[in-house]
């Protein structure tokens, strides 16, 4: 099952310039999800990171992983219209390959553990089949107030 950008925008609140998932290419609710982010030179972070050699900031790769996980949460719960997903912890992040405009980030997230409203994930970013980044993180799902 694929999810296009229109449905992604229904599932998570992020918008340009901070929406970092372009498409979901595979999802197994309550288990895992795979999506893509096409990295383009038009993105605002590249005006300063770095002008002579644009490089995707590692923190934005982690954010893309977290956004993909939030989509997985929404699909696993059936909806997050009345819920908010908050990042609680980021652990063991590693950056192994430079990601630059023209690259396609293949992002994968897996649910490692789910206890009540706290979910733990493992996630990776690959470019051209090579590991670019990996991280583990924890999120809390809360009712909207």
From Swiss-Prot:
Pfam families: FabA. SUPFAM superfamilies: Thioesterase/thiol ester dehydrase-isomerase. It is an enzyme of class 4 (lyase). The active site is at residue 49. GO terms for biological process: fatty acid biosynthetic process; lipid A biosynthetic process. Keywords: Cytoplasm, Lipid A biosynthesis, Lipid biosynthesis, Lipid metabolism, Lyase. It is found in: Cytoplasm. Involved in unsaturated fatty acids biosynthesis. Catalyzes the dehydration of short chain beta-hydroxyacyl-ACPs and long chain saturated and unsaturated beta-hydroxyacyl-ACPs. This is 3-hydroxyacyl-[acyl-carrier-protein] dehydratase FabZ. It comes from Rickettsia bellii (strain RML369-C).
């Amino acid at each position: 099952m694929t999810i296009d950008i229109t449905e992604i925008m229904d599932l998570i609140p992020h918008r340009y310039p901070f929406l970092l998932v372009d498409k979901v290419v595979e999802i197994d609710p309550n288990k895992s999800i795979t999506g893509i982010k096409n990295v383009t030179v038009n993105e605002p972070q590249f005006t300063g990171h770095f002008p002579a050699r644009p490089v995707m900031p590692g923190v934005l790769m982690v954010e893309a992983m977290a956004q993909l996980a939030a989509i997985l949460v929404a699909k696993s719960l059936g909806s997050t219209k009345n819920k908010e997903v908050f990042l609680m912890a980021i652990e063991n992040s590693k950056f192994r390959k430079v990601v630059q405009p023209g690259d396609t980030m293949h992002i994968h997230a897996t649910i490692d553990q789910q206890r009540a409203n706290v979910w733990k994930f493992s996630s990776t970013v690959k470019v051209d089949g090579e590991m670019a980044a990996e991280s583990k993180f924890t999120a809390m799902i809360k009712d909207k107030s």
